[in-house]
Design a protein with these regions (language model features):
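Extracytoplasmic small-molecule ligand-binding "clamshell" domains
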Residues: 1-72
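An extracytoplasmic/periplasmic, membrane-proximal ligand-sensing/linker region
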Residues: 2-9, 14-22, 217, 221-286
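Bilobed "Venus flytrap"/periplasmic-binding protein-like clamshell domains
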Residues: 4-30, 40, 93-168, 245, ...
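Alpha-helix capping/helix-boundary segments
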Residues: 45, 70-71, 114, 186-187, ...
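Acidic, polar ligand-binding/catalytic clefts
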Residues: 49-111, 122-123
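Alpha-to-beta junction loops
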Residues: 52-66, 115-117, 167-182
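Short glycine-/acidic-enriched loop or helix-start segments at secondary-structure transitions
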Residues: 73-76, 129, 191-192, 226-227
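Pocket-lining segment of extracytoplasmic ligand-binding domains
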Residues: 128-222
Length: 286
């Protein structure tokens, strides 16, 4: 019998329990690859568990379902020895949108000069880290060329909940901010579900594309085990009703191989903004 693989995920929403009940059932009953799931309250705790050594006074897991920031932190803190395994098709080609009130005074990036930009949680790649980074590339520096109104809700979950993006949109609508930065998936939801009056907001800028989540294995995990885990993921079929329920809940149609070229911008931004400093929990474990 195969050794159990311990997989970590962050419980950013109650649906995460349902998703991982379905994933565990698939791996154990169909893929014949036994897994157990550990839910964490923050990505920092999950990354610490992924990189923990025997004897450390923290939980240990073999594989983590990480955000892009958590994957890059795992990579940095393991001296680039952690193993990227797989990602969702929908993790490819994310973008950040800057939105403003339609017909208002902010219609281009240049109009942000001396105005207020709303940002999401400080550890959200799409709603905070990358917007600041990309705007700096465009010659707009936070605190010098524009002010920020930050909504640090659900810090530790890397923007997964969407709560801070909802706050950003509200701030733009009620005039507390002149524009706001949100992820392209949230912007699609705003429009498709009509979360604001139709035509109330317009996108004034779109970032270059980047990638989002990544299954990440600890450095010491046997590469054959990581490969079997990835192969089991790719055998999930959207045409299978039991698989589809899990895939829909997790927001994808199929699992794909790692596309590592979509993380360069966030890696640069995270290093510059101090997100690769070792967390207290990991320092204590060592």
């Amino acid at each position: 019998m195969s050794k159990t693989i311990w997989v970590g995920a962050v419980a950013y929403d109650p649906k995460v329990v349902t998703i991982w009940e379905g994933m565990r059932r698939y791996f154990n009953d169909e893929a014949r690859l036994p897994i157990e799931v550990v839910l964490f309250q923050s990505y920092e705790a999950q990354v610490t568990a992924l990189l923990a050594a025997p004897g450390d006074l923290v939980p240990r897991i073999d594989i983590a379902w990480n955000t892009n920031l958590a994957y890059l932190q795992s990579d940095a803190w393991s001296d680039h020895r952690c193993q990227p395994i797989a990602m969702r098709d929908t993790d490819l080609g994310w973008m950040t949108k800057i939105v403003a009130v339609s017909g208002g005074s902010v219609a281009t990036l240049a109009d942000l000069k001396n105005r207020t930009l709303a940002l999401g949680s400080r550890d959200s790649g799409h709603a905070a880290i990358l917007p600041v980074h990309f705007l700096e590339r465009e010659g707009l520096v936070e605190g010098r060329d524009y002010r920020t109104l930050r909504f640090d809700s659900d810090v530790g979950k890397h923007g997964d909940t969407g709560t801070s993006e909802a706050e950003v949109v509200r701030a733009v609508l009620d005039g507390r901010a002149d524009a706001g930065a949100i992820g392209s998936p949230f912007w699609r939801t705003v429009r498709s579900e009509r979360l604001v009056p139709e035509g109330a907001l317009s996108e004034i800028w779109t970032s270059p594309p980047y990638n989002h989540c990544m299954f990440t294995a600890r450095p010491e995990l046997d590469s054959s085990v990581a490969r079997r885990f990835a192969e089991a993921l790719t055998r999930m079929s959207y045409n299978n009703p039991s698989h589809r329920a899990v895939l829909d809940a997790e927001g994808l149609r199929r699992w794909v191989k790692p596309h590592l070229d979509g993380y360069d911008s966030l890696r640069e931004a995270s290093a510059h903004q101090g997100f690769f400093k070792h967390p207290i929990a990991m320092s204590a474990a060592r």
